[in-house]
Every structure is written in C-alpha cells, then in structure tokens.
C-alpha cells in the first residue's frame, strides 16, 4: 500500500470515528433532554455557518435511523447583509433534498439604523432574529426549533454571565419561549466545537461568513472564548470537567436561598439528598477520566480555514 493510500485510509477511519461521535452525542442529548418526540416537526435554523450545517446533517441522518418519526424543515433568515450570497443555501438544500424556507427580512438595515457605529449589534440583532424565527415556526407548524449552539457556546455563556452579569446561568439544552408557544432545542449540546470544525471541513460545507457580527472586535464573548481555548490547550480535559460540573450541581453547597431552604435547616434534622458537612475536612477531588478522542486534524494542524463562498 502506498503512503498516499495509507494516509487516505487513516483519514477515512478518523472521519468515520468523528462522525460516529457526533451522531452519538446528538442522539444522547436528544434522549437525555427529551428534545424530539414522535410526530414532531423540527425547524432547523440554518445560518450558513459550520454549526448549523453540522446540526442539519446529523439530524437528517438520525431521522433515517431513529425509532420515532419526525419531519425536518430547514429555515434560513436572509438578513440582507451586504454581500450575502443568496444562492448558496438554496442550492445546497436542493442538492440534499430537504424541505426548506428562506425568510427575507432586512434586519441588517434596522440594526445599522438603531445602533451607533462601533457599538455591539449582537443584542438587537438577536432579538429581531428570534422574533422572526418564532413567527416562522408558527407559520410552518413546527413543534420544535433547533439551534446550532454547542458545548463550547454553553460554557462561554456560563462564564459571560458570571463575569459580566453576576449569574450562574448558561444556555439550556431545551427551553420554552416566554409566551409558551415555542420549544427551542440545542441538539449539539454535547458536541465539542473542534469536532464540529473538523466535520465541516471534511464535509466541505459551503460556509458563509458573517460580516455583520464577526467583524466586530473585542466582543465579550470572543474574549471568554479565547480564555476557554487557552485553558483547553494548556490543561487538556478542563472543558470536559467544567461541562460535567454544569450537569452535577449541589444546590445545598451554593449560596442561593431561592433554590435551597437554608433557613429550614434545624438541629437534629437530616435532609435526604444533601451531602454531609465538609466544613472542617480537606475536600478530596478525584480527577475525572475522559476517553481519548485524538484524531487526525483535517486542517493539517494549521489554523482552520473554511471554504467561503461569495
């Protein structure tokens, strides 16, 4: 076997391993949080970025193999950003044979009119986009709205809220809208961003860059994301441990009286489910072990560059 053939075989093996891991993670998230039920119509929000492409691709595969029946419709919100390649998503969606709808709303013009030059547009843009997507879901009869946020997004949101908002709050894997009419799910909740990056490169998704928000420097989220990436490089496994912590919360050892009845603690009473007193003990922490998921980087260990389209 030639060296080229060996390399291709290894890349195929690594891609299959990556694909299985992503499908397994999405399937587990759907099961753990009851994201998709029999008879659901899932509206997958497609932006043209790596995350939403991967989400749609994985859900389409699971649709063919799941023990339940559910429909998928892809929706893209064309916000009329200058230079947005309107042909890319329709061509891609038609090529894979999925039902889709392109919603055209000039939110870009509204944002530029309302937000002074140099200020962050994310908040207003997000509110406008959310309202339009909720309306579209109602029009399509969708029972679930699927977004492409992943594990790293959830961790970044947790730290953003701690650093700037004074809250222990992240992105929930499943939520209901304020009016109770829409259920939003995040099936990529267990997926690492670096896995999604590798998958998007291997699949050669026609990535569309975001010129509206991606060009804004010094965003708080970007600062937090860089911090997390630094930790991941310097301390492998730290992000996995932190995400595990989000799923293992001991309310009796936090400080929120709204969530735990500290005033109700009385002499001689033992409350079920509460960990014992560790006030005078040296806390023993056993490092968590995670499976080795090392694999070939499809970007040849260089900075990942997506194939952008115009």
From Swiss-Prot:
Sample GO molecular function, one term: tRNA binding
Pfam family, one: ATP_bind_3
Motif (PP-loop motif): 47-52
Compartments where found: Cytoplasm
Pathway(s): tRNA modification
GO BP, sorted A to Z: tRNA thio-modification
EC number(s) from the headed UniProt entry: 2.8.1.-
One GO CC annotation: cytoplasm
Domain of life: Bacteria
Keywords, in A-Z order: 4Fe-4S, ATP-binding, Cytoplasm, Iron, Iron-sulfur, Magnesium, Metal-binding, Nucleotide-binding, RNA-binding, Transferase, tRNA processing, tRNA-binding
Residues engaged in binding [4Fe-4S] cluster: 122, 125, 213
Reactions accelerated catalytically: cytidine(32) in tRNA + S-sulfanyl-L-cysteinyl-[cysteine desulfurase] + AH2 + ATP = 2-thiocytidine(32) in tRNA + L-cysteinyl-[cysteine desulfurase] + A + AMP + diphosphate + H(+)
Cofactor(s) listed: Mg(2+); [4Fe-4S] cluster
CDD domains given in the database record: TtcA-like
Nucleotidyltransferase is among the record's keywords: no
Protein biosynthesis found in the keyword field: no
Primary subcellular site in the record, as a coarse category: cytoplasm
Cofactor note: Binds 1 [4Fe-4S] cluster per subunit. The cluster is chelated by three Cys residues, the fourth Fe has a free coordination site that may bind a sulfur atom transferred from the persulfide of IscS.
Entry's family note: Belongs to the TtcA family.
HAMAP family attached to this UniProt entry: TtcA
Subunit structure: Homodimer.
Extra information: The thiolation reaction likely consists of two steps: a first activation step by ATP to form an adenylated intermediate of the target base of tRNA, and a second nucleophilic substitution step of the sulfur (S) atom supplied by the hydrosulfide attached to the Fe-S cluster.
Function, as annotated: Catalyzes the ATP-dependent 2-thiolation of cytidine in position 32 of tRNA, to form 2-thiocytidine (s(2)C32). The sulfur atoms are provided by the cysteine/cysteine desulfurase (IscS) system.
Annotated protein name in UniProt: tRNA-cytidine(32) 2-sulfurtransferase
Organism: Haemophilus influenzae (strain 86-028NP)
UniProt gene name: ttcA
């Amino acid at each position: 076997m030639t060296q080229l053939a060996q390399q291709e075989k290894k890349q195929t093996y690594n891609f299959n391993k990556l694909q299985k891991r992503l499908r397994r993670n999405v399937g587990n998230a759907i099961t753990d949080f009851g994201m998709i039920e029999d008879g659901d119509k899932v509206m997958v929000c497609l932006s043209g970025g790596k995350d939403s492409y991967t989400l749609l691709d994985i859900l389409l595969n699971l649709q063919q193999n799941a023990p339940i029946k559910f429909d998928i419709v892809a929706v893209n919100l064309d916000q009329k950003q200058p230079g947005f390649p309107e042909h890319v998503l329709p061509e891609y969606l038609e090529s894979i044979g999925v039902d889709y709808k392109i919603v055209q709303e000039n939110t870009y013009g509204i944002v530029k009119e309302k937000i002074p030059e140099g200020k962050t547009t994310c908040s207003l843009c997000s509110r406008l986009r959310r309202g339009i997507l909720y309306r579209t879901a109602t029009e399509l009869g969708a029972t679930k709205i699927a977004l492409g946020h992943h594990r790293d997004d959830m961790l970044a949101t947790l730290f953003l809220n701690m650093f700037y908002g004074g809250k222990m709050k992240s992105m929930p894997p499943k939520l209901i809208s304020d009016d109770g009419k829409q259920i939003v799910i995040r099936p990529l909740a267990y997926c690492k961003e670096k896995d999604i990056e590798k998958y998007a490169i291997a699949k050669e998704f026609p990535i569309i860059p975001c010129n509206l928000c991606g060009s804004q420097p010094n965003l708080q989220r970007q600062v937090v994301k860089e911090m997390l990436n630094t930790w991941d490089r310097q301390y492998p496994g730290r992000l996995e441990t932190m995400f595990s912590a989000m799923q293992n919360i001991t309310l009796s050892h936090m400080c929120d009286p709204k969530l735990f009845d500290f005033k109700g603690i009385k002499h001689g009473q033992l409350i079920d489910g509460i960990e014992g007193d560790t006030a005078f003990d040296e806390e023993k922490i056993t490092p968590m072990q995670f499976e080795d998921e090392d694999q070939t980087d499809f970007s040849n260990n260089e900075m990942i560059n997506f194939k952008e389209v115009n």
